[in-house]
């Protein structure tokens, strides 16, 4: 899930693409911005078509990975069976949404729903804004599987390929699908939110796709998913903590069980990148620096409800204020991945590789310093209406 920091506290280009972009009209003219290591300047186009919201789309480089590197991923097939598929659970051992929700076939269904709604009444609107944003992000799952299938060397050419890496992609999608199911059904039963506006937002988001700037490269793609899965783990873990603080232990269990899934998935994706560092350290550190220079733009950054052109920014600002996902978390994830992949210990790199190594190893402290400076200049927050909660206002 993608969240940005409060725009009142962060005004830097450093966060423009990841979850903390500056609020600006999405119908702005084209503008140029820096892109990748060794690449030319790219542009961002603002488009408006009948079935999609106003949006910014980068003119991406396509198929940037040298074709010969596809062999690296073919060689990892046997390794994936013992190191990646182990992070999936058999379907019969997986939790399902119904395990946590009132049973519509039971005589006590209505009483169970009333109990759920009574607990939900004690939870403030700003929490529901964040929970809805998390759920909408989870519900755009078709986009995420599509994104993985754009990656050269690891795409599912038939839709049912039995190569182990592609078995992972489909099974990962199936596990993730339960997350949106659970949160969607909970929110429907809670009576606290405008389900039609939420469902419109989901349709807009899936129709808009996503713009991760991964260039069909599995190097970039798996670095992206490693970052994203850890971000989602942190976010769901914090919504679980907040639900417990508001007295809803059952909702806390729902968010917590989703966070546990995200942690397993994070482990798998970080192991893939760890293997790439072992096989091709120079190419992998260049890819890591590339993604961090472009900033990780998370899946829901094209979120729209038919009304608010800055919906994602506003949702993210609420999450930042509540401490569900913050600029500090962004820096912490980067620092975690640098350590997990032992980037500082890499040797035998090219000149460009050493520059990339220095860049990623020094970036987290720079982000924290920038956060401290901008927090000191923080302006007073404003209240903004959210259609998801019947246009009630929430402080950003």
From Swiss-Prot:
The keyword Glycosyltransferase does not apply. Its EC number is 1.14.19.2. Pfam families: FA_desaturase_2. Binds 2 Fe(2+) ions per subunit. Its main location: plastid. One of its GO terms (biological process) is fatty acid biosynthetic process. PANTHER family: ACYL- ACYL-CARRIER-PROTEIN DESATURASE-RELATED, STEAROYL-[ACYL-CARRIER-PROTEIN] 9-DESATURASE 7, CHLOROPLASTIC. This is Stearoyl-[acyl-carrier-protein] 9-desaturase, chloroplastic. It comes from Helianthus annuus.
């Amino acid at each position: 899930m993608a969240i940005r920091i409060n725009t009142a506290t962060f005004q830097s280009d450093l966060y423009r693409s990841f979850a903390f972009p500056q609020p600006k009209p999405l119908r702005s003219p084209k503008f140029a911005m820096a892109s990748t290591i060794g690449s030319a300047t790219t542009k961002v186009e603002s488009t408006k078509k009948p079935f999609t919201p106003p949006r910014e789309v980068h003119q991406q480089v396509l198929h940037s990975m040298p074709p010969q590197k596809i062999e690296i991923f073919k060689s990892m097939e046997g390794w994936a069976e013992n190191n990646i598929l182990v992070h999936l659970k058999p379907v019969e051992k997986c939790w399902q949404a119904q395990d946590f929700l009132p049973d519509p076939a039971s005589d006590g269904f209505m009483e169970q729903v009333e109990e759920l709604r009574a607990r939900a009444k004690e939870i403030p609107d700003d929490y529901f804004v964040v929970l809805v944003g998390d759920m909408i992000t989870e519900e755009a799952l078709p986009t995420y599987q599509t994104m993985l299938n754009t990656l050269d060397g690891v795409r599912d050419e038939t839709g049912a390929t039995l190569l182990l890496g592609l078995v992972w992609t489909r099974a990962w999608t199936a596990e993730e699908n339960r997350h949106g199911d659970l949160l969607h059904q909970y929110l429907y039963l809670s009576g606290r939110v405008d389900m039609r506006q939420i469902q419109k937002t989901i349709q807009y988001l899936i129709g808009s796709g996503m713009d991760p700037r991964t260039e069909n490269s599995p190097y970039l793609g798996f670095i992206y998913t490693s970052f994203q899965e850890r971000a989602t783990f942190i976010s769901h873990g914090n919504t679980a903590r907040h639900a417990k603080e508001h007295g809803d232990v059952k909702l806390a269990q729902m968010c917590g069980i989703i966070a546990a899934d995200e942690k397993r998935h994070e482990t798998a994706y970080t192991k893939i990148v760890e293997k790439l560092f072992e096989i091709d350290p120079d190419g992998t550190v260049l890819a890591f620096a590339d993604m961090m220079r472009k900033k990780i733009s998370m899946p829901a950054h094209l979120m729209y409800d038919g009304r608010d052109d800055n919906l994602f920014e506003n949702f993210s600002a609420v999450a930042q204020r509540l401490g569900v996902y913050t600029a500090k978390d962004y820096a912490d994830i980067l620092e975690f991945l640098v350590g997990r992949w032992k980037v500082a210990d890499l040797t035998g790199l090219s000149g460009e590789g050493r520059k990339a190594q220095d860049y990623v190893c020094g970036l987290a402290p720079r982000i924290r310093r920038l956060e401290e400076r901008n927090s000191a200049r923080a302006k007073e927050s404003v209240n903004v209406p959210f259609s998801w909660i019947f246009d009630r206002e929430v402080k950003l």
